Amino acid sequence: MKKKIGISYTEANFQNYEQWFTAQDLGDDLEIIILSFIKNNTEDISKCEGFVLTGGIDVQPSLYGGDMEYAYRPTAFLPERDQFEKLIYEYAKSHRLPVLGICRGLQYINILEGGKVFEDIGELSNGIHKRATVDKEHRITIVPDTLLHSITEVDRGIVNSAHHQAIRPDMLGNNIMISAYSDTDGIIEGIEYKDKTNKAFMLAVQWHPERMKRKEESPFSRNIKSAFINAVRTHKYADL
C-alpha cells in the first residue's frame, strides 16, 4: 500500500503544490491526497504519513490575540480552514509525522504553538515581500547548525516572496526556533523545532518553494522537497 502525503487545500494556486510533487518524486510507493476544509474530509487525515500545510488567506487574528483591523485584511476569513488545519497539525504532532509548512503554513504552525504574527509587516517590508503581479525576490540567510542548513547546504541565497504577514520574533511558539531570515529587514523566513528529541521532521518556510522560477535547480525548493519526501518514506510509527 502506498504511503500518502496529505496536502491541505487552498483556493490560491493549489495546482502548484500538486504539480511540485512529480511522478518521479512519488515513485511507486507514495501518492498525494487532498485534505480539503471545503469537503471536510477529516477521515482522510489518519490515512496520511506526511503533511504539507499550504499558503493562502490570513489566519483569524482571534486565534493569536491580534487586531481585527489592519492593512490588507481579507474581506472574510476562513475559520473552517483554520480549524481543519489545526486538526491536521495536531494529528501530525501527536503521531510524530513529517510536516512541511509553506507561507501561511509557517505562520500557522507558530500560532498553533502559542506564538503570534505581525498582522501586517508595513509598507517598507511589503515592498520587499508582498506579491504584486508576480512574486518578489530577496536574499535570505540560513542559520548555521539548523535542519534547514543541513538540507540546503548553503549559507545564503535568493527566494521568492508573496506575503504581508510574518512571525513576530518576540513571540515565537513553544519549541520553535528561527532557521532563516531576510537579509534586508530580518523578517523570519524559516522555522523548525528547537528541541528535536523524539520529534518528527518539521520544517516551515515563508517563501513558496513549489512555484520558484528555477525550482528544480534551487536548494530552497529541490532540497526541501527531497528532504520532506525522504522523511515520509523513512518514517516509522513511533510507540505512542
Outline where the language-model segments fall.
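Active-site-proximal beta-strand elements of phosphoester/diester hydrolases
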Residues: 203-206
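Cytosolic ligand/metal-binding cores
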Residues: 107
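Conserved G/P- and acidic residue-centered "switch" motifs that form tight phosphate/ATP-binding loops
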Residues: 103
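N-terminal beta1-alpha1 cap of cysteine-dependent amidohydrolase-like domains
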Residues: 1-100, 111-118, 122-155, 164, ...
